[in-house]
Every structure is written in C-alpha cells, then in structure tokens.
A protein has these predicted regions:
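Helix-helix packing/entry segments at the starts of transmembrane helices
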Residues: 11, 37, 96-104, 180-198, ...
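Juxtamembrane C-cap of transmembrane helices in multi-pass membrane transport proteins
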Residues: 13-29, 34, 83-92, 100, ...
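Specific transmembrane alpha-helical segments of multi-pass solute transporters/efflux pumps
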Residues: 13, 55-101, 142, 230-247
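Hydrophobic transmembrane alpha-helices of multi-pass small-molecule transport proteins
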Residues: 46, 113, 124-147, 281-302
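Transmembrane alpha-helices of multi-pass small-molecule transport proteins
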Residues: 29-80, 107-112, 135, 168-173, ...
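Glycine-/small-residue-enriched transmembrane alpha-helix faces in small-molecule transporters
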Residues: 1-37, 131-134, 138, 149-179, ...
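C-terminal-most transmembrane helix of multi-pass membrane proteins
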Residues: 39, 119, 253-315
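Hydrophobic/aromatic residues within transmembrane alpha-helices
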Residues: 24, 34, 87-89, 114-121, ...
Length: 315
C-alpha cells in the first residue's frame, strides 16, 4: 500500500507537466524547448542531492561499467518519453494528452514478458492486473469521448500516436535501468545518471530549436523550471522510489504504474483552476469515477497478493 500512496503523490506532481506544457503551448512556446529545458534544469538539483548523500562514486562506477546500456535506456526512458509527450502537447489539447498517457497503465503490464524473474524464467503478463488496468482504461476513454467529438482527426492523431510511444518508452526505460543497476544505486543516483546520459539528445534538440524557432521566451524558461522541479525532480523521484520497492512483484509493479491514471484527475482540476478550462461533462465525470474504482481494485489486489506471498514464505 505504501507504494500505491507514493505513486499517487508522484502523479500529482506529474500532473503539472500537462498543465504547464498546455500553458506554454497556448503562449506560443516550442515543444523542443519545453522538452529539453526540463532536463537541463533537473541536473543541478539532482547533483546537489546526490552530492549531499555521497553517491557520486557509486554512480560513476555504475555508469562506467555499462555506458552503452546507460545511454540506450536513458534515451528510451527519458527522451522517447518526454519529447513525444511535449510534441503532443503542442499538437493536441491538454485533456487529450493527459488522458492518452494513461495507456502507460496497459503498456506497463504488457511489458512483463520482456523481463526475467530471479529464477531466470520470463515474467508472465499478470492477467488480474491487466484486467484491472482495462477498467481504468475504460474510464479514461469515457473522459475523452465528449472532447474527442469536437476535435479534428488530425489533432486527435497528433495527440495520440506520440503519447502511445511515450507510454511504452517510460516504463520500458525505467525497468531496464532497474535491471542494469541491480539495486546498487538509490533513486536519486539513478535519475541523475539517466538525466546526464540523455544530455546528448537534449543538446541536439536545443541546436535544432535555435535554428528553427530561436531562443525560448522568459515565460517558457520559468515554466520549464517549474516542470523540472515538480515533475522532473519530485515526481520522477517519487515514482522511481515506488517502482524500486515493487520491482520484484510484477502485479505490484503494475499497480504502482497504474497510479499514474490519477494524473487525469489532477490535470482536470488544475486546468480548471489555473487555465480556466470548463468543468468536464457528466460522461467524463462517470469516467473519473471508474478510474477511482479501478485504483481501489488495484490497491486491494496488491494487498491480497502481498498477504498471500507472506503466508507462503516459511518461517
């Protein structure tokens, strides 16, 4: 249950990504800067945290042990996650992006066969977790229906396809890096290592931005800083703490990743308060209720599975 609570707190801070990205898009800011600035701003905060915790030596040893793996899975987990997400925010409405992002719930469950258990056998797709994730996804679809009716097909596709890529990339990169680190690094060290390893891609993106759209506005820089603190540092760290704690149980791990569905609730409220977005329709509110039910079912399933596991462990 602790992992579920941590995941929900992470979702709250992740929600600011969609709100501020929507705000920057409305102000005319480029998605290229919105994506790269977040990770540049994350570096000094993470360096300070890791330095105070004395983790630089461990991090350096891990990165030098497998630099190609760090570059590869950091690119997948951070670049292929956040660049498509910010592109979608510039191409579609915020509700569509935050709603479609919840596909990561199902993606996280479907990725299980790509990983080996401690016994060397590949994990199976946890069917109960998949079924519960499907319930949450139904709620997400209901939230989208009223708004999708008023959006063009091109806007819908530009808002959906990049986010589906991000929905698979984020849990895949996260889990692969957990395998690479093998529990030898704490969450802050792993996030810093992945952030630094993804820097070449962000630098290339910055060069592209300077050539095509010029420098970012002061408003976009400030909002990107807020995204870096709330989503990049606080939310990412909380989420990785939760997934680290659950990484040996695919059902529990899927439940933690499913907590990200609550982002939709936080984004709806946040956009209403900060951006003046109208209140969702009754059908959308039904979808919100289904999401909450799905979350409760995930939490209950996790609690029961944990109790059974403890009962089967000999004293």
């Amino acid at each position: 249950m602790k992992e579920i609570v941590i995941g929900i707190f992470a979702a709250f801070f992740f929600g600011f990504t969609f709100i501020f990205n929507h705000s920057m898009e409305l102000d005319g800011g480029s998605w290229l800067w919105s994506a790269s600035l977040r990770y540049f701003f994350m570096v000094p905060f993470l360096i300070a945290i890791v330095w105070m915790r004395g983790g630089f030596k461990r991090l350096t040893e891990e990165v030098t042990r497998a630099p190609r793996l760090w570059l590869r899975w950091s690119f997948v987990g951070f670049v292929l996650f956040y660049a498509p997400l910010t592109f979608a925010a510039a191409s579609g409405p915020g509700w569509l992006v935050s709603g479609t992002w919840q596909f990561t719930i199902v993606a996280g469950v479907l990725l299980a066969p790509l990983f080996l258990a401690s016994s060397g056998i590949r994990h199976k797709v946890p069917l109960t977790s998949l079924a519960i994730s499907g319930i949450i996804l139904v709620g997400i679809v209901l939230i989208q229906i009223p708004q999708a009716n008023s959006a063009s097909l091109q806007m819908v596709m530009l808002g959906i396809l990049p986010v589906i890529i991000a929905a698979f990339a984020y849990p895949l990169g996260n889990r692969k890096m957990m395998d690479v680190c093998g529990g030898r690094l704490d969450t802050f060290e792993r996030v810093l290592g992945m952030t630094i390893a993804s820097m070449p891609a962000w630098i290339i993106m910055d060069i592209w931005a300077v050539v095509t759209v010029g420098l970012p506005s002061s408003s976009q820089v400030f909002q990107s800083l807020l995204v870096a603190i709330s989503s990049g540092v606080i939310a990412t760290t909380l989420f990785f703490i939760a997934t680290d704690r659950a990484r040996h149980n695919q059902g529990k791990l899927a439940a933690v990743e499913a907590t990200q569905s609550t982002e939709v609730l936080f984004v709806i409220v946040g956009e209403m308060l900060l951006l003046g977005v109208v209140m969702p329709t009754s059908l959308a509110l039904v979808g919100v209720g289904i999401i909450i039910i799905g979350m409760l079912l995930h939490s209950y399933h996790t609690m029961i599975a944990t109790k059974k596991m403890h009962l089967t462990i000999p004293n």
